[in-house]
Amino acid sequence: MSMTDPIADMLTRIRNANIRGSSEVAIPSSKIKKSIAEILKDEGFIEDWEVSSDEDSFPEIKLQLKYLNDGQPVIRKIKRESKPGLRVYLKSNDAKPVLSGQGISIITTSKGVMSDRKCREEKVGGEILCTVW
């Protein structure tokens, strides 16, 4: 069975792992998911990530989720913005901070996948994949 929206599947797996309080979540690997994981790590939303592969199975991205001292997840909300049926685009001059800078948008651009902060620095727009805070 094919998956119609693998990015939404990734975000749902992260959301479900946060609800369960899991320290790690496994996600089927792809280039765009690796880029999203790297941005989440750089912005401080996850501890780390790595790609693991056995000879018998497909490669997986293992995300190590991050929690506060009181056990609350660092990712309070993670939301898919652009969907296969409704694409959402952002012009370079329309990139505004998410929740006054407390969150980020992850955007795919002609220069690669980057956070909204980096888009403002580079003055580039693109498709908004998701928002995290």
Predicted feature locations:
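Core subunits and conserved enzymes of cellular information-processing
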Residues: M1-W133
